[in-house]
Amino acid sequence: MSTKYESRYASSPQTVKQYDTQELRNEFLIDNLMQNDTINLTYTHYDRYIAGSAVPTSSPLTLETIDPLKSEYFLERRELGIINVGGTGSVTVDGTVYELGLKDALYVGMGNKDVVFASDDASNPAQFYLNSAPAHTNYPTKKVSKAEANKIELGTLETANHRTVNQMIIGGIVTTCQLQMGMTELKTGSVWNTMPAHVHNRRMEVYLYIDIPQDQAVCHFMGEPQETRHIWMQNNQAVISPPWSIHSGSGTSNYTFVWGMAGENLDYNDMDVAKITELR
């Protein structure tokens, strides 16, 4: 079977503050992504979100339902966001083919039965990063190239957080039930992401860190603003951020991260900022 999955239950901030390093990593780090010829999925009980990957190498991969969904097919009651972080490939949705280059995105609406991933070149396979959330109705499937993303410049080189936010699967570009996805690229010389940090109790979030050079790493910060913890991240690893947690990071070089979130609303700017001087 080419599909593997695991489930993660939600944890309270009172419990998480007692975790040691390995317990934190076991609960929040997703480190089994981007395996050839495999679809890997992590089902988290935070907003019933799924994060995973599909890397078709020797043959195409079909998105299959998993037992926690108790559904006939994967998107029976769900929507799906895809961002390709590898070689050129395609996603076929109920017979319609969508070509995805590096850092292109695709939104797939609820009710689509057949989703098939393929790579153009097995020696440089597509690496499809997948995010999925529960949905209540069908919205049209839509491709969003990186060039079509809504781009926002934030930060400065002086504060080491100069970055470009690429909003891709988001209101104004794609209509979704609750899923939002995009990608933030740090400029050379900048290492901090999402600083000042924030929380948004209305939504959970997952980060996938990419473009981390070999022998470099990113220190991801999580936890309540007054009770922070850290998880060291390598390239192509993801981390789950509960609604009550900050989600920020600092790298030993610049890097990119793909963000995805779901929850109470679709207001990207709905967040509670934590002052830098008050973080603990």
Curated annotation (Swiss-Prot):
One of its GO terms (molecular function) is 4-deoxy-L-threo-5-hexosulose-uronate ketol-isomerase activity. Induction: By ulvan and rhamnose. Zn(2+) binds at H198, H200, E205, H247. It catalyses: 5-dehydro-4-deoxy-D-glucuronate = 3-deoxy-D-glycero-2,5-hexodiulosonate. Binds 1 zinc ion per subunit. GO terms for cellular component: cytoplasm. Belongs to the KduI family. This is 4-deoxy-L-threo-5-hexosulose-uronate ketol-isomerase. The lineage of its organism: Bacteria, Pseudomonadati, Bacteroidota, Flavobacteriia, Flavobacteriales. The gene is kduI.
